A protein has these predicted regions:
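Sec-dependent N-terminal signal peptides
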Residues: 2-13
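Glycine/threonine-rich flexible loop motifs
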Residues: 124-136
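Conserved anion/nucleotide-ligand pocket segment
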Residues: 174-246
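Glycine-rich oxoanion-binding loops at beta->alpha junctions
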Residues: 83-115, 127
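Conserved functional hotspot residues or short segments at active or partner-binding sites
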Residues: 270-383
Length: 404
């Protein structure tokens, strides 16, 4: 018992910010729900700074309102399901849990019947290609049709609020893993994204965002003092999102092992046909800011190249504030093509992962440049540069002032 008390004290003592759910209950904003029937879209990451479940908090204060439904995203309400796994409806605390990653990804009229308010509280990864924000956007679209209020309890962007990098989303590649036209790394919180989506896409949802207190755009997740709960099985640490923003898309090609199936998800890139020392030396010779590439040797336990000796690199981020995730991705791809053209292009041309790769990128330009351009790196870096500049201007009015 004493150990548990010490743990809870230490978590609370080092929390430097208050997340949206903290603010909601500290300031008794739940009183605005009196007389209403509410639903909550959340999962295991929905906790306050003392590690108390968002569901538990809403139920504890449900004297004048009623929690009538829960919605769960990819990986399920407890986070134990695999990526892309179809999940059935269930019950939690005798409340129906409607899965939005099973037979339907949108709440049906039957699910929404009698609901006055839907609350969203989940930790995402700070990149466009992640299904949790899309689950919210689908909720907002359906809520607008049924005159249901949506409350978003804001949370930190684990990549920070200053990194804006990567391609925009072209309409052709709009999908559940990338639904709105923002850069791959957008530098916005989920609350800011919700406001952006509501206005830019003319959703007209009755939206309320509960901002955090104390969070600043320059913060890393560790700076917040909040405990990190892995939002999905392969995002185990608070710095993993920064690595996954560089290598996650590479994994969709199905030709490189990116640490899925090993102990370092998203932090390594390798294959049996790569020479580690040569690859690392050429990458480091480009002197990208904030990163060092260490030669690395490994044998995956499962997944791509299971049981085979692989060589590649371990990404060491030396300065997160100047690290450019997509520049790293493009350098990795361009250097692989330059050093191992036969092996790389043969696999690129025949991969079954082209569609997922383009959906994650939000464009097929990356794939086409890799296929056709002899010197691909700088062509890749130039993708959507002007569009990103325009986005930086457009997003300004949606940024929460207290975060600056």
């Amino acid at each position: 018992m004493m150990r548990l008390l010490l743990l809870l004290f230490s978590i609370n003592a080092f929390a430097h910010i208050s997340s949206g759910v903290d603010v909601f209950f500290q300031e008794k904003k739940y009183e605005s729900l009196n007389g209403k029937r509410i639903a909550i879209l959340t999962n295991h990451t929905g906790v306050n700074s003392k590690m108390r479940s968002t569901i538990e908090l809403f139920l504890e204060h449900a004297n004048e309102y009623e929690v009538v439904a829960l919605f769960s995203p990819e990986h399920g309400i407890q986070g134990q399901h695999y990526a892309a796994e179809s999940i059935d409806h269930s019950h939690e605390n005798k409340i129906p849990v409607y899965s939005l990653h099973g037979k339907t990804r949108r709440p049906t009229p039957e699910m929404l019947e009698g609901i006055d308010v839907i609350v969203y509280d989940m930790q995402c990864t700070g990149v466009r290609a992640y299904t949790y924000p899309t689950a919210l956007f689908y909720i907002m679209e359906e809520a607008s049709k049924h005159n249901i209020e949506v409350i978003v309890l804001d949370r930190p962007n684990p990549i920070g609020g200053l990194t804006v990098d990567g391609p925009m989303l072209e309409d052709k590649w709009r999908s559940y893993i990338g639904y709105i036209n923002v850069p791959y790394c957008h530098g916005m919180t989920i609350g800011e994204l919700a406001s952006f989506f509501n206005e830019e896409y003319n959703i007209k949802c009755d939206l309320q965002v509960i901002p955090m207190k104390g969070w600043k755009r320059s913060m890393s997740y560790r700076d917040t003092g909040l405990a990190w709960i892995p939002p999905s099985p392969n995002i185990p640490e608070p710095d993993t999102p920064l690595f996954s923003s560089s290598t996650g898309i590479l994994g969709e090609l199905g030709i490189l092992n990116i640490g899925i199936g090993f102990t370092l998800p998203f932090k390594i890139v390798g294959a049996p046909w790569i020479k580690a020392k040569e690859f690392a030396e050429k990458l480091n010779g480009q002197k990208l800011p904030g990163v060092f590439f260490q030669p690395f040797y490994f044998r995956p336990f499962f997944g791509l190249y299971k049981g085979l000796d692989c060589e590649g690199i371990l990404i060491q981020i030396t300065d997160p504030k100047i690290y450019r995730p997509l520049s790293v991705q493009y350098l990795l791809l361009g250097m692989l093509k330059s050093l191992y053209p036969k092996e790389f292009l043969k696999r690129l041309e025949t991969t079954s992962g082209k569609d997922l790769f383009c959906k994650a990128n939000g464009t097929d330009a990356v794939y086409e440049i890799l296929l056709k351009e002899k010197y691909a790196v700088w062509k890749l870096i130039e993708i959507h540069q002007e569009e990103r500049k325009a986005f930086l201007e457009k997003r300004k009015k949606y940024l929460i002032p207290s975060y600056n």
